[in-house]
Amino acid sequence: MKTTIARLIAKENEFDNMRACALEIAAAVAANEPGNKLYAICEAGEPNTLVFVERYVDEKAIEMYRNSDHMKSLGRKIGATLAGKPEILFRLTDCT
């Protein structure tokens, strides 16, 4: 399994739009990506901030996610709400 934990910070007055886009992405992932085992969106307790936890069975599943039509369109949509690039906090690989 491959897990990524990332922090996204919204522009001023864009948090609600960012959160709505994040929920759209999570729904699209759940509906279309059998290689995804977890796509959690967490409010971080910091202003305008969400933390994403994404878990995939392997690199092939991650590539499918990155190249999916829904991620291309929704990725642009959420990108317009962000104050900067997403910050990757951790990349984890299960050893068992």
Across the structure, where does each feature detected by a protein language model lie?
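Short, well-ordered beta-strand segments in beta-rich or mixed alpha/beta enzyme
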Residues: K2-I9, A40-R66
